[in-house]
Amino acid sequence: MYGADLPADQQLEFSHRYILGVYDLYDRLTKAFPDVLFESCASGGGRFDLGMMYYAPQAWCSDDTDAVERIKIQDGTSYGYTPSMWGAHVSAVPNDQVGRLTSIDMRAKVAYFGAFGYELDVTELSDEEQATIKQQVAFYKQYRKLFQFGTFYRLETPDTSDNVYGWETVSHDKQTAIGMRYQILNGANPAYIRYYFKGLDPERRYTVNDGSEVFSGAELMNAGYFVPRVMNRLQSPKVPSDFHADMFIVKAVD
């Protein structure tokens, strides 16, 4: 990149001047249209920064929309920015970037953590998938504020747990939390799985996924929640495959 109007000894100013020009344009746009939410694009182009967030408080994380890739991308983004800033969508499969096939359930459970949406041709989906999308949209609308503005926790990464990422968001009053456990690759006869929550009220009692069993917050954080898992097809034909996500909705009962 270079500036045709700049002399040779000022060419290093070009990129800086360009960004100042972008800020100036955004300033005029946001003043002219104060009720419009602008989204900047994209972190792959180095435009996911605090200066851009001043004008466009939502950014497209990456053109890489594969669910597995997006777990890593959004996990890294979480170190600097809150989920309300992440543009996160369910896209078509096979994925355009990596050709991977993931379930619409997995894709949605990754995209829930962020400014949720879809970028695919719904007319190419089966009736079952279209019905699933309606359910996903209704679910996200119910918990949108929690996903975008709750307290976000990173619970597991491949550095601490094989092939696994774990995220959680907790409401500020600690009444509700949603945890997600992403299994990238499955393995034979996995060990017993416990999901350890964070940020709950240790004195309160909670249910998980509207179950009948009641747990204290201290128990869920220190002893963990047992995740039922089919070990092999002799137990059930529904063995979790690769690219699987478990979701835990936690609600206070007192």
Segment roles from a protein language model:
Residues 217-254:
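C-terminal beta-strand-rich structural cap/linker in extracellular carbohydrate-active enzymes
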